[in-house]
Amino acid sequence: MKLSEIADNVGSRKKRMRIGRGIGSGKGKTGGRGGKGQTARSGVRIKGFEGGQMPLHRRLPKRGFNNIFALEFAEVNLDRLQEAVDSKAIDAGKVVDAAALVEAGVLRRAKDGVRLLGRGELTAKLNIEVHGATKSAIAAVEKAGGSVKILAPKAEEGEAA
């Protein structure tokens, strides 16, 4: 037996069917695409169409809604604040508010307000003004000798403030 004499078992590799090669081949004329029309052409994909079967997006029930009045807060953790103080981006002597956080590069933008979260350690004494804070965050700031003032959420434009 030589390497050049090795062959596959009979029927283990089936040749692919070449379509559109005459009606005698059994896959000629329309080439398995049915009649004429949009789906007989190349590049056709009807999004969500599953061959007449009820598509998934219609089988599943509708659920929930989007509240147009929901407020979206930018979130800041204590460890991120401590990093900013350590790198001198935030002055510990001044009031830390949304504008100061954006200016320091801690936040990209303040959205509808800022919410303080309690992840990490805070050793700097900071006076913080935010629109929301967790109990653990408030406790950590006060333990470090600082204070947290909770502001009212930003009023909607056109609303009397």
Swiss-Prot record:
Part of the 50S ribosomal subunit. The lineage of its organism: Bacteria, Pseudomonadati, Pseudomonadota, Alphaproteobacteria, Hyphomicrobiales. One of its GO terms (biological process) is translation. InterPro entries: Ribosomal_uL15 (IPR030878), Ribosomal_uL15/eL18 (IPR021131), Ribosomal_uL15/eL18_sf (IPR036227), Ribosomal_uL15_bac-type (IPR005749), Ribosomal_uL15_CS (IPR001196). Keywords: Ribonucleoprotein, Ribosomal protein, RNA-binding, rRNA-binding. It comes from Rhodopseudomonas palustris (strain TIE-1). Binds to the 23S rRNA. The gene is rplO. Residues 21-37 have a biased composition (Gly residues). PROSITE patterns: RIBOSOMAL_L15 (PS00475). Belongs to the universal ribosomal protein uL15 family. It comes from the Bacteria. Residues 1-43 are annotated as: Disordered. One of its GO terms (molecular function) is rRNA binding. Pfam families: Ribosomal_L27A (PF00828). PANTHER family: 50S RIBOSOMAL PROTEIN L15, LARGE RIBOSOMAL SUBUNIT PROTEIN UL15M. One of its GO terms (cellular component) is cytosolic large ribosomal subunit. This is Large ribosomal subunit protein uL15.
